[in-house]
């Protein structure tokens, strides 16, 4: 169900979702949307165990706590199979409104390792000059 705008929304009850809580069928809820992550288990950067622990339930708060990247959020959309039935939405805990934050970053990959590497080089040069003077 990649293009939900072309099709009617498929609703799943909480009871239906809870049945999909194993490695053969791994469903979870994020922001009232239902995701089938069975084929993504082995690819998940945090390991498949993290997803299996959340399977069959609402993982919204844990998903937001981790602080997933924009790319991860876009990728997650490809696994949407429907939505939690409106009658069941009150049965799950609402995530704290303060947890729903996204950080847009214009920094690229090099800031994650080049800046620390240069800093380490500067510190080692300072140490070398300091020890050579004594």
Swiss-Prot record:
Question: What is the top-level taxon of the source organism?
Answer: Eukaryota
Pfam families registered for this protein in UniProt = Cyt-b5
Coiled-coil positions are none
Q: What residue stretches are annotated with the Cytochrome b5 heme-binding domain?
A: 9-85
GO CC terms in record: endoplasmic reticulum membrane; intracellular membrane-bounded organelle
Annotated Gene Ontology MF terms?
heme binding; metal ion binding
Question: What start and end residues bound the annotated signal peptide?
Answer: none
In the UniProt record, does the keyword Electron transport occur? Answer: yes
Q: Which chain regions cross the lipid bilayer?
A: 109-131
In which residues is heme bound?
44, 68
**Cross-referenced InterPro entries:** Cyt_B5-like_heme/steroid-bd (IPR001199), Cyt_B5-like_heme/steroid_sf (IPR036400), Cyt_B5_heme-BS (IPR018506), Cytochrome_b5 (IPR050668)
> Family per UniProt?
Belongs to the cytochrome b5 family.
Q: What function does this protein fulfil?
A: Cytochrome b5 is a membrane-bound hemoprotein functioning as an electron carrier for several membrane-bound oxygenases.
The name of this protein is Cytochrome b5
Task: Write down the species.
Answer: Sus scrofa (Pig)
């Amino acid at each position: 169900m990649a293009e939900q705008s072309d099709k009617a929304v498929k609703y799943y009850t909480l009871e239906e979702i809870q049945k999909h809580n194993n490695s053969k069928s791994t469903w979870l809820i994020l922001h009232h949307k239902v995701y089938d992550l069975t084929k993504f288990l082995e690819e998940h950067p945090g390991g498949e165990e993290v997803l299996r622990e959340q399977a069959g339930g609402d993982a919204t708060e844990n998903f937001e706590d981790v602080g997933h990247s924009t790319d991860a959020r876009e990728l997650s959309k490809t696994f949407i199979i429907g939505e939690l039935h409106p009658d069941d939405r009150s049965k799950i805990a609402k995530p704290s409104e303060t947890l729903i934050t996204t950080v847009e970053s214009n920094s690229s990959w090099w800031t994650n390792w080049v800046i620390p590497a240069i800093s380490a080089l500067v510190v080692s040069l300072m140490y070398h000059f300091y020890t050579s003077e004594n």
